[in-house]
Design a protein with these regions (language model features):
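Acidic/histidine-rich
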Residues: 31, 42, 55, 63, ...
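Membrane-interface segments at or immediately adjacent to transmembrane helices
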Residues: 39-109
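Solvent-exposed soluble domains appended to multi-pass membrane proteins
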Residues: 101, 105, 109-116, 121-201
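Transmembrane helix-bundle segments that form internal channels/tunnels in multi-pass membrane proteins
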Residues: 1-60
């Protein structure tokens, strides 16, 4: 829920509890309006878990594809509820899936979101090629920083290591990224950025 929605719900709740006459019932529409702000939040286009081992791509219309694997069952269920899907579509095993608009091979996947080409790369060799042709890159592997334009790299293994799970939304002005670290805030035990790192990791 957006911060504004939480504030509206809180105000409505206080109104409902403090007042004792019939006017207190006017707080109910206020609380409802606060909860309705959830509908204003665009669902993430791509979600990546805290170790990069689980990826979900939101196709819209209640359809989502998730990377294969038997682990991360709790996260899978949580993501399905968050994206309001009963069951994800199968992850393309090879070639281009015309229905999902996603092309995958063992080195990663490429898709189009908001009119831009997005590559999710798990192989260093493929990363070099995708860094030349894709508009945005999500690196699930390490490569030398000089081989990929920083402006194209939305997410790297270093970001995942430092910030945990990521939710990415693509729009006309480019991608916006929400991380689990932002939600929990900085803690004494949180990992911190090391600008001296030689690799995108």
């Amino acid at each position: 829920m957006p911060t504004a929605g939480l504030v509206i719900v809180a105000i409505g709740g206080i109104w409902l509890c403090v007042l004792r006459n019939r006017i207190r019932l006017c707080a109910l529409p206020v609380i409802t309006a606060g909860f309705m702000t959830i509908l204003l939040v665009k669902a993430p286009d791509i979600i990546i878990n805290r170790d990069g081992g689980l990826v979900a791509i939101n196709l819209g219309g209640g359809r989502v594809v998730m990377s294969p694997g038997n682990g991360n069952g709790f996260e899978r269920d949580m993501w399905q509820r968050r994206l309001a899907v009963e069951s994800p579509d199968p992850w393309p095993s090879g070639g281009i899936d015309r229905v999902s608009r996603i092309g995958c091979d063992p080195s990663g996947c490429i898709t189009e979101i908001a009119g831009k080409t997005v590559a999710i790369v798990s192989d260093p060799v493929s990363a070099i090629e995708d860094c030349r042709r894709a508009d945005y890159i999500i690196l699930l592997t390490r490569i030398p920083r000089r081989l990929c334009d920083d402006e194209r790299v939305v997410l790297s293994t270093f970001h995942i290591w430092r910030d945990g799970a990521h939710a990415i939304r693509f729009g006309p002005e480019g991608p916006t990224v929400e991380t689990s670290r932002e939600r929990r805030g900085d803690r004494p035990w949180s990992r911190v950025s090391d600008k001296r790192r030689q690799y995108i990791e």
